């Protein structure tokens, strides 16, 4: 039988990393299980260079920097970390729970699920032969390589607006969105309108023109009208969001609401001893932000400790008094 842990955290993104660190402050024996080959979740893999604006105390923090700071914080303690392991099943046991993954079985007294939106892949651009072009991208890495290029960004949410603003500093940039209004933070939209980004609204991509495996032009068509334009480009970035999959979540006996785990004010799920924090959980008034998830993590940890040791107070000493 495998070693018994106090708290096993499913998910190694920002919320999972901070939950693990905080659990160590409560002197818990902690394990992290993640299906990805590295820690950090979406910020580390999908937008390592994108600036994150909703983490308190930082005005210019990238996904990579956030991940590195959280990992460095966690490295002050010994944490068992299991990567490339997909959770297949969770079953109640005498000591707590048995977690079966694609690699092993894990024994734990309590569980904190911090898996974000689950497995994720970008929503594809649905135009003929789109996937055959090498200069069509869904992620940005090493933004400096696009300096001096013609860049077209598709989308109207935070990622599209933020990337358009980032590219504008180094490249000739256009942003194409199907509506006149953007779904991004108001502050970012004001920056966009004051920038040199060429805003194309309300237009949708209608055709790709290319040669030798690369797109040379994007044809866009007016949503309600007959106008069309041909935009020259060197690189096309698609920011239509992500399709997420919660995998076997529905089979773990947890009450769900629209593919998210219902929790109470203790971050406790419908199964005693299992908690959830971050984007994977749901409650009335829930806002999906990294900052929100980081705040939910200590609540989940403290109540998990109280589940293990009912005689201990849920409210611990403040870290400043330790």
Swiss-Prot record:
Q: Which residues form a coiled coil?
A: none
Single annotated GO MF? flavin adenine dinucleotide binding
Gene3D superfamilies for the chain = FAD/NAD(P)-binding domain
Which reaction(s) does the protein catalyse, per the Swiss-Prot or TrEMBL entry?
A: 2 reduced [2Fe-2S]-[ferredoxin] + NADP(+) + H(+) = 2 oxidized [2Fe-2S]-[ferredoxin] + NADPH
Which Pfam families did the record assign? Pyr_redox_2
The entry's keywords: FAD, Flavoprotein, NADP, Oxidoreductase
Quote the PANTHER family the UniProt record gives: THIOREDOXIN REDUCTASE 1-RELATED-RELATED
Name the record gives this protein:
Ferredoxin--NADP reductase
């Amino acid at each position: 039988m495998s070693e018994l842990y106090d708290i096993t955290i499913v998910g190694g993104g920002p919320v999972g990393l901070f939950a693990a660190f905080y659990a160590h402050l409560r002197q818990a024996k902690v394990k992290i299980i993640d299906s990805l080959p590295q820690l950090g979740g979406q910020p580390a893999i999908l937008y390592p260079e994108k600036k994150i604006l909703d983490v308190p105390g930082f005005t210019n923090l990238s996904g990579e920097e956030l991940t590195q700071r959280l990992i460095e914080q966690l490295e002050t303690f010994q944490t068992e970390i299991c990567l490339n392991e997909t959770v297949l099943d969770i079953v109640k046991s005498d000591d707590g729970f048995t977690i079966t993954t694609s690699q092993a079985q894990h024994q734990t007294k309590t569980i904190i699920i911090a898996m974000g939106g689950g497995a994720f892949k970008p929503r594809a651009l649905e135009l003929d032969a789109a996937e055959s072009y090498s200069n069509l991208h869904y992620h940005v890495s090493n933004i400096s390589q696009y300096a001096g290029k013609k860049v077209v960004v598709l989308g109207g949410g935070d990622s599209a607006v933020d990337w358009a603003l980032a590219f504008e500093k180094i490249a000739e940039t256009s942003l194409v969105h199907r509506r006149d209004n953007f779904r991004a933070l108001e502050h970012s939209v004001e920056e966009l309108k004051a920038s040199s980004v060429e805003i194309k609204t309300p237009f949708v991509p209608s055709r790709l023109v290319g040669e030798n495996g690369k797109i040379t032009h994007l044809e866009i068509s007016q949503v309600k009208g007959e106008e069309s334009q041909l935009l020259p480009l060197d690189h096309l970035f698609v920011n239509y969001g992500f399709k997420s999959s919660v995998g076997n979540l529905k089979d773990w006996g947890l009450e769900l609401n629209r593919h998210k785990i219902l929790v109470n004010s203790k971050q406790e799920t419908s199964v005693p001893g299992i908690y959830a924090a971050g984007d994977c959980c749901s409650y009335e008034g829930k806002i999906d932000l990294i900052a929100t998830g980081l705040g939910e993590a200590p609540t989940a940890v403290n109540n998990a400790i109280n589940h293990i040791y009912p005689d201990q107070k849920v409210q611990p000493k403040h870290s400043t008094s330790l």
